[in-house]
Amino acid sequence: HYDPSIKKILPHSKMYTIQIGNERFILSGASLSSDAPSYFTNYFSQSANSDQVLFIDRSPRIFQYIYSHLQGYHVEIDDADTFTGLFSDALYYHLPQLRQLILNSDYYYANIGGESIKVSKKLLSGRGNTPNFFTVANDSLYKDISDIITDMNWIRPPPQAAPSLNRSPILFKELVHMLQGAEPEIRSPEHRRSLIKEAKYYRFNALAEKLQNIIEVYNPFTGAQEIAVSLDSIN
């Protein structure tokens, strides 16, 4: 739970300068102590370094998120590459609270067909649709490597890319809409088969079964083929 108290690891009112790449950031001792012990507090706690500029060769764009986090703001992450970069730097800077916030994020992130996808963990945790690709990938890519890096005490985390899939982002979004409760909009038998194939790929087994229970029927009153859904597949 949230604890507003801040340990006095560094003098709270003293300002410290950190240069990340080609950008400088100034943070108070209170901000740096709010997520500690860390790379920063370990450095500035040494008397010889207390008035020095700390130079670090990492991404200033990613550090903007860390800067906001240390100041006490909620950090909103919109894309998979930023999520993965922030996770790597939370490990690099030894920020325990940020690491836990990322691992306990409410969202899964991935690059699907070249498009960044952000989807609610709660949405993908429904009965019959979990475990799935995202639950397994999230644990293996983020949680497991986090534990390994911590245990091995590496100087910096290895290069890491967000989960990337050569699948259709359009079909994935349609599956997500169905998981949100929307009725399937089946345009053709081929479209239905594609949706079933994608649902099975992601291990959305209950959704795949629902799609398999959709049948085409001929309506003699309209003279057209229509989509019908078995009553057994409607929750």
Regions found by a protein language model. Give the residues of each.
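Hydrophobic, ordered structural segments
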Residues: 68-74, 78-101, 175-183, 187-219
